[in-house]
C-alpha cells in the first residue's frame, strides 16, 4: 500500500491558488487508498459543485462500482426528516411540541412527564434501544411497532425527563408513531406525500428489505481476518423513523437547501428545529461550529453504512458523505470542511513505529482537553490513552514528538518540545481536525 505523508498546513497558499477541487480530491483519494473509504462525496457551495466523486464498490460480488448516483442507507440522518414531519404537523396546529407522550401512547410509563420536545432533542430519558443487547438478535426480524416499543417501554428511564441529554433512537421511533397517530397515515406515506414528493427528491425513500432499488449499494464490513463480508441485514422496521431512509448525496444537498430556505417548514418552525438546546442539539440535528463557522450537521450509522451531512449557513457550504462499508464518513466530512475553510488538515497515511528514549514520555503524561477529555499515562515504558471504563489504547511513537493510536483509527497525538525535552504544546489529530490540547 502506498504511503502518503503530507500535511495541508499552508492555508494562505490554498487561498491564493483557490484549487479546492484538487485539494479535496487529494484528501479523499488518500482516504480511499489508506483507510479504504467506500462511498460517495459531495461538496457544494453557493449552488456550485466544488467536488463530487464516488469510490469503491456498490456490489463486490458483481464488481459494480459506486457512482455519484448510488443510493445508500443514511441511518440517523433520517432523524432530521422525522423532526420536520413533527414540525409540519405542529405548524398546522395538529400537535404541539409541548404535548405529553401520554396523549399519543396513554399507557407509556411516565408518559405524563415526557414531551414531544424532549423526544426531539434526546432529553426524554428513554433508554436507547440500540444499546440493549436483546435488540440485536431480533434486528433481522420484521418486528411490529408494538414489539419494538415493548423492547424499551418498561426499562427504567436513564434520568428524570428534561434534566439531561442522552442520544435515544427510541425517542425518534416514538416520534414516528406520533406522526402516524396524528396524520392518519403510515410514517412512510406521510414523509413521501409531505416532504419527498414536494421537494422532488426522486432518490430518497424509506427503505425495507423487499424494495428493489436501481443503483442501490450493498453494505459491507470486514471480519476478524480482515476479509470483506456483507454487513448484517437488519430489518428496517427496527430503525424506522430513527434511521430507515435511503438517499443519495445530491438529494441530501437538495433537502438541506430546502430546509434552510424555509421551503419545508415555515420560518418560525425552521428556527425552532435548528435552535440548539442541551448539548448543542436541536430537533433531530446538531448545531455547533467549526472554528468561527456555524455548522448544522448530523451523522448516521447502520450496519454496513455510515453517513454525514453538514451545512454552514453563513458560508452556504454543504458537505455530504455516505459510505457503504462503515467508513468514518464524519471524519472525512470534517476534513473536507476544514479544507474549504483553509484550516490545517492531515492527509491520511500509514505511520511507522520507531524506537525512542522512553524517558521523554514522562513529559507527556497528564490530563488534557481537546475535542474531549484526553488522559495520557505511561505504563511499562509505553504511552497510553486512558479512559475510565474502556481498555487503554497504546500510542506508538512515529517520532519522539508524534504518536499514533494503535487501533488503526487514524488518530494521532503530537507535541512541541523545547531543547530540554519539556513539552510546550500538544495536539490531538483525528476526525478531520487538529486541535490543541489544553491542560486540565
Task: Give a label for each model feature.
Residues 78-82, 115-116, 171-174, 241, ...:
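Catalytic-loop motifs flanking and including active-site residues across diverse enzymes
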Residues 50, 108-115, 125-131, 188, ...:
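Secretory-pathway/luminal and periplasmic proteins that interact with or process carbohydrate-rich
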Residues 18, 26, 33, 37, ...:
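Active-site-proximal loop and beta-strand segments within enzyme catalytic domains
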Residues 113, 147, 208-211, 289, ...:
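Coil residues (strongly favoring Ser/Thr
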Residues 1-19:
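Bacterial Sec-dependent N-terminal signal peptides
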Residues 17-53, 180-185, 189-193, 197, ...:
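Catalytic loop of the DD-peptidase/beta-lactamase superfamily, centered on the K-T-G motif
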Residues 8, 108, 123, 277, ...:
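Residues that line or immediately flank small-molecule/substrate-binding pockets and catalytic motifs
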Residues 122, 207, 371:
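Conserved residues at the C-terminal ends of beta-strands
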